[in-house]
Design a protein with these regions (language model features):
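Conserved alpha-helical scaffold segments that buttress catalytic/binding sites
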Residues: 13, 17, 27-169
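Catalytic cores of large soluble enzymes that bind and process phosphate-bearing ligands
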Residues: 4
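Conserved ATP-binding subdomain of kinase catalytic cores across diverse folds
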Residues: 7-21
Length: 169
């Protein structure tokens, strides 16, 4: 429901506050998911883009001018990408199966500010390849951007146990 979606966004705000104020890591478990929600409308079971909203919220805090979002999921976070593409102070990295719903996330798209890294993987991708991609692409991209805050938008549908997906982590 709408009320639950608002509670989820507030949980992400609380997570950002814990990290910035208490210098601790935070883990927010919130439903509905968010990475398909576009700047102006919901999509793909997502009402609000929790990670994108949390990144913008973090940028309002003193001393925070660079936030990165790392998204791993079997689906590309098209909504998060759309939000990040308009803000040079947020970087977005997505590992996702491609081609697959929603049909976005080609590795050629980097955004106007070159702050987007899409890493499409084929169905059947294993943990070994995923780890290699982290070491060779994700970590260098995030290190170069040098964020003061890293937000992880973790999808768990790329596991071997999820029979609706083809990635085998």
């Amino acid at each position: 429901s709408y009320e639950v979606a608002l509670l989820a966004v507030n949980a992400w705000f609380d997570g950002v506050d814990v990290v910035l104020n208490e210098k601790k890591s935070a883990f927010t478990i919130a439903r509905p998911p968010g990475h398909h929600a576009m700047p102006n409308y919901g999509m793909g079971f997502c009402i609000f883009n929790n990670a994108g909203i949390a990144a913008h919220y973090a940028l309002t805090k003193p001393g925070i001018d660079r936030v990165a979002i790392l998204d791993w999921d079997v689906h590309h976070g098209n909504g998060t990408e759309a939000i990040v593409a308009k803000n040079p102070n947020i970087a977005y990295c997505s590992l996702h199966e491609y081609p697959f719903y929603p049909g976005t996330g080609a590795d050629t798209y980097q955004g106007e500010y070159r702050n987007i890294l899409n890493i499409p993987v084929k169905g059947g991708t294993t943990l070994d390849l995923y780890q290699h991609l982290f070491e060779q692409q994700v970590i260098p991209f995030l290190s170069q951007f040098n964020p003061q805050l890293l937000i992880i938008s973790a999808g768990y549908d790329a596991t071997r146990a999820d029979h609706l997906a083809n990635v085998a982590l």
